[in-house]
């Protein structure tokens, strides 16, 4: 029994099953590699599920398809396991059910009914709903279902439930949320029918209730039925509004009367423009929804979205806001998180940093689930054990201590190698030391990495050590993993070396205790030197965050940011929130061109709505002066010269590859690997995976 998380780690009865704790995973479809092109689950999916069952997830909900997908171009399909008849059962058992049951886990099948449906063998798969109403034009083409098709839909659902129970699933989830077929029937915004399935709320909920009742008849009284639905959907159309909380409070008892054993609440639809899952939303924010539903519900209530911190989960459970925590990203980040909760291992929890890489890939770009900011074991990495023991113990030199370097060091050590981790600065962390100033989520990841390094006896840390070829010769490693980070991209315009100009690299240098080179002006030069000395001894991300918010140096109250990619946008957001007048200048067509799809809309919207932010896309800087930035902007009318006033000019153009040390090591060491930004500049997920891969290759 957990003492730190007494409710989160406690069991809960849901009809005929007992959840071993209060942490369940919501449905997902991880895509290619996890499922074959002909929609059969693979060993990769089995390994993915087994990791989470072994990690003590109370209930794993997994998406499966109730129809045979025989008419879709294999190159344009998001693969799903199938449950259309008994022929699917052996694969479901081998690759989904048995890997979970092997560890005493529970697995719930969710028949896939989001937008697409295939009513019969002859009809192509496509989007269906109660009416031909689209919330977004690019997510349109909905076909209004006939009464005959509605009956076929129900029978297909009941058949899927029968197959899933026969296969050995422990529960079934009815998908009635996120803009799927059933949720479109429930919302007036997408249902303008005039028959028994349209009009009043009772009519619009009728199909969902018929599905639940029919599933209950198929599975029997003791088999749990979970219902995923969205009490608040944040959508509207000329036909009317979406669901309101007033509607939801009437719907919840109807669902229970029909046979719902557990409410699995989501928020919004796929078409919703409101930020739902990004770091703009605080952890546990959406529990106000479950708290309202609990006022009328007699069955347990789970709430999904933005649940990443077990301490927040526990507090919300203790406050009675929900009965079960539903989520997916916490499990993608750390498959063993529930076990660590039950064992009170808070320092060992690898928490989600809300980078949304998983969502951007799977949902926005229809890619497989291959990347996570903190967990390298996704995609092909699941095809082998996590830390295969090395056949020969090697002396491994890891140079650089960002996410690539530390993950490489920890992985190599776990495999049995002796690891020496070198860092030129006074503390570990690499670029995460700086990104933690902008993101408390990165700060907690940094804390996790430092804790793991400190705990591992096979990792020896060398701080304040600049590695040169001579260092390598003296160390005589069997293998070297070089993770020294990228080189800052140059910016050659008049005034780029002015005393009012700063760069992201300047801040990283200062955090590492080094005075950035070339700082002009006596006061300016003194401050950079003093700041570097101070931070070399007393730096913490939260302290630097507070100082950045309050201090007028080195960032004044009037800032121009050159470079509107992810680094510039994150810095711009900090400037916006701290009340600075901010200009973001970008040569490309869009500011935030490389920001992930999950974050970009909300981020750019916040810039547009802010009175203290101006964005300048298609704008080329020609000079920097002490008063600001001279630039040329391309418009429909032609090029236009601009002057953008600014007391501070921040250059955030990103990084270029940095192969110098890696190439110098190759004549000296048998095995040399370049990882992270020094090999290929990218996001934190790329660095994390590259470090892990290199260590596994030793």
How should these model regions be labeled?
Residues 392-402, 553-565:
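Beta1/beta-strand and adjacent pyrophosphate-binding region of the FAD-binding site
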Residues 443-490, 498-500, 506, 515-516, ...:
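A Rossmann-like FAD-binding core segment of flavoenzymes
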Residues 276-281, 385-387, 393, 433-444, ...:
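Short, contiguous acidic/charged loop-to-helix segments that flank catalytic cores in large enzymes
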Residues 339-346, 492-512, 663-676:
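A short, gly/pro- and small-residue-rich
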Residues 568-571, 595-596, 675-698:
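A conserved FAD-binding loop/helix module that cradles the flavin
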Residues 417, 433-437, 505-506, 512:
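Structural/interface elements that position substrates and couple domains in central-metabolism enzymes
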Residues 417-430, 581-592:
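Glycine-rich FAD pyrophosphate-binding loop
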Residues 1-399, 403, 407-419, 427, ...:
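Flavin-dependent oxidoreductase catalytic cores
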